[in-house]
Amino acid sequence: MDPATNSPIMPIDLPIMHDSDRYDFVKDIGSGNFGVARLMTDRVTKELVAVKYIERGEKIDENVQREIINHRSLRHPNIVRFKEVILTPSHLAIVMEYAAGGELYERICNAGRFSEDEARFFFQQLISGVSYCHAMQICHRDLKLENTLLDGSPAPRLKICDFGYSKSSVLHSQPKSTVGTPAYIAPEILLRQEYDGKLADVWSCGVTLYVMLVGAYPFEDPQEPRDYRKTIQRILSVTYSIPEDLHLSPECRHLISRIFVADPATRITIPEITSDKWFLKNLPGDLMDENRMGSQFQEPEQPMQSLDTIMQIISEATIPTVRNRCLDDFMADNLDLDDDMDDFDSESEIDVDSSGEIVYAL
């Protein structure tokens, strides 16, 4: 698996919060389609936090609202902690826990692949976080290495992040849209069937486990890894293999085979994974009591931001500033954006952009 080429963080005119505000700027730490992320310091607690800036206006869509509302409801050690949203003159800012260890993806790229014990250590934490999400009736729908962060401890704690594609069965209907990243997407999603988001998350967890163990994606053609059509075909036919020279225990191979099952009705479930023999081996004590896991997060000095306040801020953020409207007009008049996937089958039901993201809800 080749490391993704990280684009340089372009300077952007974002407001540094004023002296009267709660956070002080430290440095820029990331950028993407959403905007930019900054490392900030909480003036009161001195804690480092990550602040994700999204430009006010049309970028504040239902995905942003869903991300914030779902993320706010989750309080678990294996999920990046949501703190609050703030409205600046030009951006909506989402304040959350800072994971100093970076992406799990980067750790695998540096290591090549993990030992079976190390992969299990992170997989146990991933399943713990996903199990909690499902207990809260939230399906992530975009689980991948880039959406799993690590804290800075010697034995890193895994943190699930980015709930932009998440769906709540309490607040939303049964998932019917095609979202996520092709390498991680379950067959039933690609077939545009109404699907169980929890079982689709299981498949994505299986892809994450495979990559940790093998150092490559299970359904990519090694000769043409960027051929997304071929990746999709291999997912639909569940065509994958484990290198012959890779020494994995029979129990590990068996678990992978129970995850990569095309029919979601016969695929292993999260509760079944948590009782699997391979999963339970060397299970850390703090992961054994799921009820205790959800209560480890206590911040009495910082009450949770109310839902009414959040919805009001999001509503105001949908109104673009004058500066942003002018910039949008300029960009529309001067840029001719090419679609890198023009050669993708025009009759295909799936739309994929150049980053490999499934971009249209079908």
From Swiss-Prot:
Role: Together with SRK2I, key component and activator of the abscisic acid (ABA) signaling pathway that regulates numerous ABA responses, such as seed germination, Pro accumulation, root growth inhibition, dormancy and seedling growth, and, to a lesser extent, stomatal closure. In response to ABA, phosphorylates the ESCRT-I complex component FREE1, which is required for ABA-induced FREE1 nuclear import.
Native organism: Arabidopsis thaliana (Mouse-ear cress)
Protein's recorded name: Serine/threonine-protein kinase SRK2D
Keyword ATP-binding: yes
Keyword Glycoprotein: no
Active site: D142 (proton acceptor)
UniProt xrefs under InterPro entries: Kinase-like_dom_sf, Prot_kinase_dom, Protein_kinase_ATP_BS, Ser/Thr_kinase_AS
Residues binding ATP, per UniProt: I29, G30, S31, G32, N33, F34, G35, V36, A37, K52
The entry's keywords: Abscisic acid signaling pathway, ATP-binding, Kinase, Nucleotide-binding, Serine/threonine-protein kinase, Transferase
MF (Gene Ontology): ATP binding; protein serine kinase activity; protein serine/threonine kinase activity
Catalytic activities: L-seryl-[protein] + ATP = O-phospho-L-seryl-[protein] + ADP + H(+); L-threonyl-[protein] + ATP = O-phospho-L-threonyl-[protein] + ADP + H(+)
Induction: By abscisic acid (ABA), salt, and osmotic stress (at protein level).
Subunit structure: Interacts with ABI1. Interacts with FREE1 (via C-terminus).
